[in-house]
Amino acid sequence: MLLISNVSVVVLTKNNQNTIEKTLNSLLDFEDVVVYDNGSTDETMNIVKKFPNVNLVQGEFKGFGWTKNKAASYSKNGWIMIIDSDEVVNRDLLEYLKNKNLKDDTVYRLNSNGYYKDIQVRYSGWTLTVKRLYNKKVTSFNNNDKVHEHVLSEGLKEEVLEGSINHYSYHSISEFIIKADRYSTLFATNNVGKKSSSPTKAFFNGMYSFFRTYILKQGFRDGYVGLIIAFSHAVTNFYKYIKLYELNKELKK
């Protein structure tokens, strides 16, 4: 088997015992995989240690941007591909990478297919391209991005690679609730004192998020799953701005 030796994969983990093995099995074609764990208390690290091509690092979490840059610093290669701990790299992308001539002035996007349980979500904004492959000697993530982090690509070219990854981001409705609380808190703490908010703004942001996901992005075509996603987006955005409102009030005291 021809291994991919010029690209290092970086994966962040914390209590991902249900998904990490499937993720790492899809990365066996890479010689260098860095798993950066932030305090797992389940079987995640024991599972990770079974893979000979993985360098397991334990460290702190300071927001997604900073943490991904920190994890990338442990890689053997300049080229970094970011994969989430609930994603699977498909064979077509692996084979394409083995023959791809990567260019330093380009940030590469991956086609991402979203799944709820084992149901592919074809609408609702879940089929997209994401900036995941870059040369760390040229660019990086913004260290200040606590959530919704992205690779800085100003002044660089962007190219979508052939092939895809599957993103198994949610396996139950409870996970939507947990992530809504986590991401809304990260947003609020990252923007306290920087952005204004109000109960009215929180309400209308939530309502518009539902409309955008369910109608504009045709979430209704995903059946009941589309309804779950649309409501989750509404709740997340409502809590983002209502939490920010409360934190701003505390700041003024």
What label would you give each PLM region?
Residues 6-8:
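Cell-envelope/extracellular polymer assembly enzymes that use nucleotide-activated donors
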Residues 18-21, 42-50, 92-93:
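Acidic helix N-cap motif at the loop->helix transition within catalytic regions
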Residues 66-72, 79, 83, 90-251:
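Catalytic-site signature of metal-activated, phosphate-bearing donor transferases
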Residues 26, 37-46, 84:
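A conserved acidic beta->alpha catalytic loop
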Residues 4, 29-30, 75-78, 102-103:
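Active-site acidic short loop of glycosyltransferases
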Residues 45-74:
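Conserved donor nucleotide-binding strand/loop of the catalytic core
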Residues 10-29:
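Short, well-formed alpha-helical segments that are part of the catalytic scaffolds
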